[in-house]
Amino acid sequence: MSKRIKVMSVFGTRPEAIKMAPLVLELQKHPEIESIVCITAQHREMLDSVMDCFGIRADYDLNIMQQGQDLTAITTRVLERMREVLAEVQPDIVLVHGDTTTTFAGALAAFYAKIPVGHVEAGLRTYDRWSPFPEEMHRSLVGRIATLHFAPTANNAHNLEREAVEGDIFVTGNTVIDAMAYTVRGEQFVSDELRQVDFSRRVIAMTCHRRENYGQPMRNIFTAVRRLALNYPDAEIVYPVHLSPVVRSTAEELLGGVPNIRLIAPLDAVDMHRLMARSYMVMTDSGGIQEEAPALGKPVLVLRRETERPEAVTAGTVKLAGTDTEEIYRLAAELLDDPAAYDRMAKAVNPYGDGRACPRIAQAILSHFLGAQPPEPFVPAH
């Protein structure tokens, strides 16, 4: 191939952007690759802050965000806009990340245009199509479409092998560990609200926003957190509340007015990573944070019934707390009361990456198109 390889990276939400940004920067280093960025802006405000943080500009901005749009509307808008962009650019490969609606629609648009797809963060599974919804089905379907599968861990690769997916599978580590090399430098916060937090206290960083937790599960979680705050007045819970009206109204109802719970605006990637780095522990239903916090040596309680990231549970850095009020409270109280239990989780090995996932993915693309040496797989330290 005499011309440069046209690699189009497609993403639309903040978590995707955090994990794709270091890959875009890596692709730009290779003279054999022409890197093109296409954003759908499924999360407009949150996405822009990440792009600014990494100094990345979009070549194409589909700007699909509309008030109150459902999954069908997002999917059809991405498909229609992507058709035009793909016809104009004619990339050699389209890279999508993870399991969002943008991921699925972007991969499907590339498939319809007969363009190969590379799936970053491939092979994560719960094997329950309804949990997480719609992410589990999205990533499974993208697994059928993709030609190159970039699995963060050996376990993810085994899932793909069992499913007999077509194409080549590479164990790369997770790109979020690469991203943290950019974000965790220094301790200064952008957010004024974070500058007011007293980090001499035991700070608990918290997030809760997943669609499958809407309703009673979220009320259970917030009830446990409220009780924890009231019973441990020396601890401070910092909760950047998602922009979703469902999440905001429930958080304000159940967590508002408690002196040691700070409900703050959503954070950019830099502030979120630095908040976790200075916190005592983390409570979250986020997928990415299950990978990020262990890299910082922080125990994580996962506020979900199941996780597609079992490696950290096995390693001991993460515990599945579920959405039962009593169980969440018990596990959080144990970490606040029992130094030995805390140390066991804080000192466990991070199984998700060594900060070299992006170079491995770039090398895999060069290997596929130019016959270069394939990358060595990521193997966690023991």
Give the predicted meaning of each segment:
Residues M1-Y239, S244-H382:
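Nucleotide-activated sugar donor-binding and catalytic core shared by glycosyltransferases
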